[in-house]
Amino acid sequence: MHYQNVRAAKFIDRPNRFIAHVELDGSVETVHVKNTGRCRELLVPGCTVYLEKGTNPNRKTAYDLIAVEKGSILINMDAQAPNKVFHEWAASGGFAPEVTAIRPEYAYGGSRLDFCLETPRGPHLVEVKGVTLEENGNALFPDAPTERGVRHIRELQRAAADGLDATLFFVIQIKNIASVAPNDATQPDFGSALRDAAAHGVRVLAYDCDVAPDCLTIRREVPVIL
């Protein structure tokens, strides 16, 4: 996926989940943050961030904050990007060449899962999780507790028990990641639910991405350490 009209800026602070203050062209600009997560390890005062200029002249902020430099690592932190890049990748045959249709926001059980992929074997349910937390070349998920994430895992496990193909798919919004693992220190029940689901038929996959300030593309499979 590609962004348009991307600018570099210097991060100042984040007064709430939705906006941040940055220095752009010598002036302080209020921008929309496209990730309501904590991102405390990413949004450090003085770091370089990347902004996409919005196209709606009536919006309150002119720019969206979409990526950040963490030392020498560029991390895409757009929470909407993982589903978009997965959809592009699956549509091009990356997930499975036999996919004949992609149905987003698929209602199953008491939840809406991100995708239902139609295949000759039948429906394949996929829940996508974007990963932005990096430690020593490895990735962890989640960066903050997510009860919704646990609920989605349990829905996938029910789907597998019903005989459907079901996959939890981590899109790591960082390049050259060695592995990804559940962040048990932050949310032990997410890791427990993921391990239980994997033991009962849910496939767990992870791919890292090629990341540029104006682009994000699924790259290669990364080991999942359960």
Model-derived features: positions:
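Conserved catalytic cores of phosphodiester-cleaving nucleases, focusing on short active-site segments
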Residues: 9, 113-143, 156
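Nucleic-acid nuclease catalytic cores
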Residues: 137-147, 154-186, 208
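Acidic-basic catalytic patches of nuclease active cores, encompassing PD-(D/E)XK
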Residues: 40, 72-104
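OB-fold/S1-family single-stranded nucleic acid-binding modules
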Residues: 56-73, 218-219
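Short, charged beta-turn/beta-strand-edge "cap" motif at the junction between a beta-strand
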Residues: 13, 53-58, 172
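Short aromatic-glycine-enriched beta-strand elements
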Residues: 16-21
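Domain-level recognition of nuclease-like catalytic cores that cleave nucleotide substrates
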Residues: 173-226
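Short nucleic-acid-contacting surface segments enriched for D/E, G, S/T with interspersed K/R
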Residues: 37-50
